[in-house]
């Protein structure tokens, strides 16, 4: 069987942390996205700042940033990283209806930051759900995916059809 290999599996088929010691340090950036679909009334509550637990968007933004910094504690084979930047943008979308979440993680180092960006989006979405669940238990988290990455030996990646 040819094609891409799983980098976290050793020759014996066991899970193994990748040795990045010989890789060059380069600027690495990853962007991920996701959404929380909800009832229009729930979105209105959040926009007005009337959710029972407080400012949903600000809290979810902070939760996403904190989560990116803790990725190696949550995902077993991720390296602890010295992130230089994490941003989480949360945008209301009436057409969804709900909130769109985008995270960017950046560093200068020997391994990528895709998992950090994905973790930031995931935890921000979970925080939105937690803070608004009293008003809407039918919320749906979805669309969590890598949008783009740059830097490193494998080169740049941009999801087809995305302009970033």
UniProtKB/Swiss-Prot annotation:
Gene Ontology biological process terms from the UniProt entry: Mo-molybdopterin cofactor biosynthetic process
GO molecular-function term, one example from the UniProt record: cyclic pyranopterin monophosphate synthase activity
Keywords for this protein: Lyase, Molybdenum cofactor biosynthesis
Residues annotated to bind substrate: 77-79, 115-116
Enzyme Commission (EC) number: 4.6.1.17
Catalysed reaction, written as an equation: (8S)-3',8-cyclo-7,8-dihydroguanosine 5'-triphosphate = cyclic pyranopterin phosphate + diphosphate
Active site residues per record: 130
CDD domains: MoaC_PE (cd01420)
Pathway participation: Cofactor biosynthesis; molybdopterin biosynthesis
Domain of life: Bacteria
Gene3D superfamilies listed in its UniProt record: Molybdopterin cofactor biosynthesis C (MoaC) domain
InterPro entries noted in UniProt: MoaC (IPR023045), MoaC_bact/euk (IPR047594), MoaC_sf (IPR036522), MoCo_biosynth_MoaA/MoaC (IPR050105), Mopterin_CF_biosynth-C_dom (IPR002820)
Record family assignment: Belongs to the MoaC family.
Record text on subunit structure and interactions: Homohexamer; trimer of dimers.
Chain's role: Catalyzes the conversion of (8S)-3',8-cyclo-7,8-dihydroguanosine 5'-triphosphate to cyclic pyranopterin monophosphate (cPMP).
UniProt protein name: Cyclic pyranopterin monophosphate synthase
């Amino acid at each position: 069987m040819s094609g891409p290999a799983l980098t976290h599996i050793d020759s014996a088929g066991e899970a193994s942390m990748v040795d990045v010691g010989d890789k060059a340090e380069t600027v690495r950036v990853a962007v991920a996205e996701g959404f929380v679909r909800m009832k229009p009334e729930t979105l209105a509550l959040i926009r007005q700042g009337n959710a029972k637990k407080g400012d949903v968007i600000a809290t979810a933004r902070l939760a996403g940033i904190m989560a990116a910094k803790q990725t190696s504690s949550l995902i077993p084979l991720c390296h602890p990283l010295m992130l230089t930047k994490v941003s989480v943008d949360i945008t209301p979308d009436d057409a969804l209806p709900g909130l769109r979440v985008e995270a960017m993680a950046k560093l200068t180092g020997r391994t990528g930051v895709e998992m950090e960006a994905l973790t930031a989006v995931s935890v921000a979405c979970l925080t939105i759900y937690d803070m608004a669940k009293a008003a809407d238990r039918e919320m749906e988290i979805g669309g969590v995916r890598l949008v783009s990455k740059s830097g490193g030996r494998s080169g740049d990646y941009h999801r087809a059809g995305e302009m970033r």
